Amino acid sequence: MRPSMSLIRSVSRVARRGYSSESVPQRKVAVLGAAGGIGQPLALLMKLNPLVSQLSLYDIAGTPGVAADVSHINTRSEVKGYAGEEQLGEALEGCDVVIIPAGVPRKPGMTRDDLFNINAGIVRSLTAAIAKYCPHAIINMISNPVNSTVPIASEVLKKAGVYDEKKLFGVTTLDVVRAKTFYAGKAGVPVAEVNVPVVGGHAGITILPLFSQATPKANLSDDYIKALTKRTQDGGTEVVEAKAGKGSATLSMAYAGALFADACLXGLNGVPDVVECSYVQSSITELPFFASKVRLGKNGVEEVLDLGPLSDFEKEGLKQLKPELKSSIEKGIKFANQS
């Protein structure tokens, strides 16, 4: 996986990739839920990304203000805000990438699955609009529970006759970001140099960081590995509790969402060897959806990479996560097919 790159220095990043300002393709990106806790900082970070030429910000309300604020930033992209369902089609038309952080946030005592009944309906309606107005766009699903919302989106797209498994992604990048941060702290290595694959799903025990494959290598005890794994799995809860009922992991999620969207854009633009972890349709295991390393390209998913060698602890973790992940997938598919 590529090391995380500073979005603030995004212009120089593009120069390092060999683009001139004239050669960067025109790319329209939409953020659905742009007035929310994740959506606002995500809109800011996408405005800083020079791979974006048009930034479309949509929410049920509040978006004109967010769009006006962000539009004053002196970067490449043109920003437009859209509010209300009647403007959703215009927001989506011509999009290359659609990022969906829409939905209600977690509160203390809530799991991601507690959000299901509200967020599942939101995801279903937004995906139906994507199927109608930009059926070939890459979809980055942030709305929780991702283990279920990605299967919901797949079923909606299938019903519309436009499903392309290569273009639907569950964004699990925050799990990777957390695993890198926590590992670097314990291993005493520079965090910018750290890579840690995270596989499985995006909730609780379904999150499985593969610390045995982490680089740079560090000789950490089994107890340290178990503690790092648990902290990565509980990272969202850690933030919810720290915010004492006043929010969830909005800022770090926006950062992770922007990183993954940047990777998708780079792949679309033909940058070679862009590899990130994501929750996608997969044949890596017997489950229809699974998070693992994915090579990104001009069509979205170019290749879903194998899990690689696992430690005994990771093999057990993989075994333990499968029933819960299977249940979440089935829950999403059932919801999508109820109506």
Swiss-Prot record:
Location(s), subcellular: Mitochondrion matrix
Top-level lineage group: Eukaryota
Transmembrane segments: none
Main subcellular location of this protein, as a coarse class: mitochondrion
Any one GO CC term of the record: mitochondrial matrix
GO BP, sorted A to Z: malate metabolic process; tricarboxylic acid cycle
EC numbers for this chain: 1.1.1.37
Classification via InterPro entries: L-lactate/malate_DH, Lactate/malate_DH_C, Lactate/malate_DH_N, Lactate_DH/Glyco_Ohase_4_C, Malate_DH_AS, Malate_DH_type1, NAD(P)-bd_dom_sf
Binding site for substrate: 106, 112, 144, 178
Entry keyword set: Mitochondrion, NAD, Oxidoreductase, Transit peptide, Tricarboxylic acid cycle
Coiled-coil features, chain-numbered ranges: none
Active site positions, chain numbering: 202
UniProt GO molecular function: L-malate dehydrogenase (NAD+) activity
Catalytic activity: (S)-malate + NAD(+) = oxaloacetate + NADH + H(+)
Binding site for NAD(+): 33-39, 59, 119, 142-144, 253
CDD domains per UniProt: MDH_glyoxysomal_mitochondrial
Pfam families for the chain: Ldh_1_C (PF02866), Ldh_1_N (PF00056)
Family in the record: Belongs to the LDH/MDH superfamily. MDH type 1 family.
Record's protein name: Malate dehydrogenase, mitochondrial
Source organism per UniProt: Fragaria ananassa
